[in-house]
Regions:
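N-terminal membrane-sensor/transducer module of prokaryotic signaling receptors
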Residues: 2-165
């Protein structure tokens, strides 16, 4: 009987872990983010802003796992954001809620190198915990840039946004 109880206890723990894992969003990798960003740049170079409709398709190739494409002009105006369309048209260059001026840093990178990684903190999906995230951005032939962000694997949680001074 004691052995049966132990086996049932282990099975219950394993089941619980699987249930919690099933609730967690599937996360994209940095390599997947870079590949998606490169594909987005190619599409924008071919179609211009008409590519935004393709980026908005939740069942398409530009929204996989937690990855999606966003686009911004060189002044900081959000041009396309499939997950938060209310941001489109807003100038976010001075956004600094988490202390890292991520959009200003993206613009500076697009102006100087044309492409690369920008690191920042962002709330992890379903929580208020800040985690390390990186976006791979590429300035396209049309004069703006697009990017795709991925959470850094195994990065520790930082403080909650309310804790930031």
């Amino acid at each position: 009987m004691k052995k049966l109880t132990s086996v049932l206890g282990v099975a219950l723990i394993a089941f619980s872990l699987n249930v919690f894992a099933a609730d967690a969003p599937e996360m994209g990798t940095e390599a997947e983010a870079q590949t998606m960003s490169e594909s987005a740049a190619t599409l924008v170079n071919e179609k211009g802003e008409a590519a935004f409709e393709t980026f908005a398709d939740a069942k398409g190739d530009f929204q996989k796992k937690d990855l999606y494409v966003f686009c911004m002009d060189m002044e900081g105006k959000m041009l396309s954001h499939p997950k938060k369309p209310e941001l489109v048209g807003q100038n976010l260059r001075d956004f600094n809620k988490y202390g890292d001026k991520l959009f200003d840093n993206m613009i500076k990178l697009a102006e100087t190198d044309g492409k690369g990684w920008v690191e920042y903190k962002w709330p992890y999906p379903g929580t208020e915990d800040l985690k390390a995230k990186k976006s791979y951005i590429i300035k396209n032939d049309k004069g703006f840039f697009c990017g795709v962000g991925a959470y850094v694997a195994d990065a520790p949680a930082d403080e909650k946004p309310a804790d930031k001074k």
